[in-house]
A protein has these predicted regions:
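Histidine-centered divalent-metal-coordination microenvironment in nucleic-acid enzymes
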Residues: 73-74, 96-122
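Short secondary-structure junctions
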Residues: 17-21, 95-99, 136-138
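Catalytic "initiation/cleavage/transfer" segments centered on a nucleophilic residue
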Residues: 7, 134-142
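Helical (often loop-to-helix) elements that flank the catalytic cores of nucleotide-handling enzymes
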Residues: 82-92, 112-137
Length: 142
């Protein structure tokens, strides 16, 4: 399996649509302007390959048609953020996840599951984790 196929498998969600972000060259307060929207077509291998190559920003919709998910995320937008301290705390709590620095300097914490789980159950658990990390007000996806 190549990287695009692995990512498409890891980010399985709603099969009828995906997110897309178009970034303009226009800047406001130092940040590039972007417009995100839903495209009512499935997320495909070709789209994932374009995303990896930097051609088009896309995103999977985590919740499937049965209100279940196989991945979720925390979006921490608190600054300054000590990423090493965050990772140490997650390891201390024995939370299996992947931490990525966001473009703005915050963090995206991704969780992946072998089986589909209730989106509500994930949100409840993610809220517990975010509170334990001291970031109880962060965004939870889904």
């Amino acid at each position: 399996m190549n990287l695009s196929e692995e990512l498409l498998e890891a980010f399985k969600g709603f099969s009828g649509a995906h997110g897309q972000t178009d970034v303009s060259q226009e800047r406001t307060a130092g940040k590039q302007k972007a417009k995100s929207f839903i495209v009512r077509n499935p997320l495909t291998l070709q789209l994932m390959e374009g995303h990896i190559s930097g051609k088009k920003g896309i995103g999977a919709i985590p919740i499937n048609e049965e209100n279940k998910c196989r991945f979720g995320a925390l979006d921490i937008d608190e600054y300054p953020l000590d990423h090493n301290q965050l990772i140490d705390k997650l390891e201390e709590l024995k939370v299996p996840c992947i931490v990525c620095r966001s473009k703005s300097g915050g963090a995206h914490i991704f969780f992946f599951f072998k089986e589909w789980m209730s989106a509500g159950d994930f949100r409840d658990k993610a809220a517990e984790i975010s509170s334990a990390l001291g970031h109880g007000r962060c965004e939870i996806f889904p």
